[in-house]
Structures are given as C-alpha cells and as structure tokens.
Amino acid sequence: MKKKDYYEVLGVSKTASEQEIRQAYRKLAKQYHPDLNKSPDAHDKMVEINEAADVLLDKDKRKQYDQFGHNAFDGSSGFSSNFADFEDLFSNMGSSGFSSFTNIFSDFFGSNKSDYQRSTKGQSVSVDIYLTFKELLFGVDKIIELDLLTNCSVCFGSGAESNSDISICNNCHGTGEVLIQKNMGFFQFQQSAKCNVCNGAGKIIKNKCKNCKGKGKYLERKKIEVNIPKGIRPNQQIKLSQKGHASINNGVNGDLIIDIYLKESKVFEIVNNNDILMTYNISYLDAILGNEIIIKTLDGDIKYKLPKSINSNEFIIINNKGLYKSINKDKRGDLIIKVNIVVPKNLNKKEKELIEQIYEQTSFNPENNIDQ
C-alpha cells in the first residue's frame, strides 16, 4: 500500500517550521493516542503520526525525505517487511553481535516482554499557554483544566473489587508471556508471545471493580495550578513532573509539559532578548517645550523630562525596566521607547491664532537637501 505523504499526515505545509510540526504532532497525539482513543484504527494512526514526526523533526531525515520521498528510507536504509521472522532468527542464535543488533530493532518496535513485566512511565501531556506581555514580564499563576488518565479511587488501579479477587494466571504463571515453538527450515525456535488467557497482564480478576468496570483507570477532569515565573521567555517549557497521565502498568505518572507562547501585542516587542520596545505618542507641544510627561509602562506610570525639540523616531531609554534576564532573578533589560510626535488634526480658533503668530515670527525652516 502506498504510504501517505508525511506532511499530509501531520497536516502541515512543506515549509512548516520545527515548532509548527511539533505543535501539529502534539495535537494529533492527543487525538489518536490509544490510551485516550479507543477506536480500532487509533493504533495504526498513531504509528503513522509517530513515523511522520520522527522524519520531519530530524533535519537530516527531513532533507532526505524532501529530496527522495519515501524512497529515501527504502531498501538498505529501511526495514524489511519480514522483520518479525528476521528478528526471531537472530534473537535465538545466541551471538552477542546479533543480540545487540536485535536490541536496535527492539528500540524501534518494542520488545516481546509483556506490559505486566515492564513498569513504564505514564504518557506525558503537552499544553500551550499564551501570556500577555505583563504576565510574561512579572510571572503569573494559571489554572488549567485537563482530562487525565487517573488511577481508580476505589481499587487504586488494580481493576479488582478486592485483593482477594486477584489471582495469578495459571497459563503464563504470572509472567504475562507464553513460549511458542516455531519451525524455520531445519531449525526450531521458541518465541515469547503475549498470554492469550490474561492478555499479558499475568493475573486474572474474578470480580471487577464496579467503579472503573475492571479497567483500573478512567479519565478525570482535573484542575492544575501552574506557576509561571518571571524571567521566562516565549518558546520555553515548564515541566511539572508526574502531573500527566497515570501509567497503565504500575509505573509513575507521566509529566505535564507547559509550552510558553506570547500573545501578539500592538504596543510591545521583545528586542535584544532582554529589552522591551514600545512606540509612545507625545504631544507636539511637549516635544517643543521639553516638558515633563507621564509615560504609561508595564511597571506603572513613570515621570520623564523630555529633552527639548525631540523628534519622531528618536528613542528614550529607561534603564532596568525591560524583561528579567533570568528566571526569578532581579536583573533586567531596558525599556526602549520610540517617540511618535502627534500633531492635532483640528485646532480651535484661539490655538490657530497663536500658532499663526508664532509662524509669522519664527525663523525656523527645516532643511531639505535633494542634491545627490
């Protein structure tokens, strides 16, 4: 069957940035992960999504894919369609060289060990939080709500009504695995497979927990407080350990990953990593007279004495009023104010008379040099 284009799988354009690809992957992973999506095709869809992300988030692989398409990973650089038999053959040879080769395949496709034997960490969760400039500057506490896979509050994840309802599977003797003999030419090999009686759990539950119907887990809506410290920057992450989904096999919870983004602002802009740039409107009269004005900033109102005859597009620098240079530290960048002198469109009669008097008496004439 022809493989689907990796960009189409993730729903991004061929010019998408790494950040856009990561965001698309996280969105699809939340939608199709088998722990959260019980539809029959969720597993295959997730495999397809992971495969696409693995290539497009690797600069070298993406370059090869853009040039050669799926052919870049076929043949000698790809994996055999008969991979299972190939791995079975070498995994039973007992050679240290082949055994390490088999481990490489296990890293990609998982080993034959049962979930019951391996205690793995729960699925991590990624959440995007968009901050205003003021929230980014001073830090903020946010409450987020998530549907998280959680251990049942009655059976504590066992899935049984009581401990006495749990017994060891007699078919696999609690390992979750059974040995299957396989003939390959003149050779006969043994292969581990998931126990078909306990479905790899290694245990049999007589009476299932009524609260979770024997699953041991369920999705629960949770409120989580996230402290976003001052000094953080857009596109940085905050990790809350073990605040993600519960493990499906008695491991620790996954993590909650917070991706920080900055809301668009018509007023403020980050420059030089630590400085804040803003454009500020100033009256033409204040500019001419060099008056003291009040500048409204994220820190509140600041009094500032204008230099006489300041012009538009000149800059005012207010030290130590920019972003904090590092998390929870007090050193800051600067606030850079770009001056925009505003002239009124309409004047009252008195204003017009006074300005006409000044015009008649002034010797000021701006220079315009058009000589090349």
UniProtKB/Swiss-Prot annotation:
CDD domains for the chain: DnaJ, DnaJ_C, DnaJ_zf
Q: What binding details are noted for the cofactor? A: Binds 2 Zn(2+) ions per monomer.
What protein does this entry describe? Answer: Chaperone protein DnaJ
Residues that bind Zn(2+) 2, according to the entry? 169, 172, 195, 198
- Similarity-based family: Belongs to the DnaJ family.
Q: Give the protein's cofactors.
A: Zn(2+)
Query: Which parts of the sequence are CR-type zinc fingers?
Result: 139-221
Q: Mostly located where? A: cytoplasm
Its GO biological process annotations read: chaperone cofactor-dependent protein refolding; DNA replication; protein refolding; response to heat
Tell me which residues bind Zn(2+) 1: 152, 155, 209, 212
**Which species does this protein come from?**
Mycoplasma mycoides subsp. mycoides SC (strain CCUG 32753 / NCTC 10114 / PG1)
Sample GO molecular function, one term: unfolded protein binding
The record's annotation in InterPro entries points to: DnaJ, DnaJ_C, DnaJ_domain, HSP40/DnaJ_pept-bd, HSP_DnaJ_Cys-rich_dom, HSP_DnaJ_Cys-rich_dom_sf, J_dom_sf
Q: Which SUPFAM superfamilies match?
A: Chaperone J-domain, DnaJ/Hsp40 cysteine-rich domain, HSP40/DnaJ peptide-binding domain
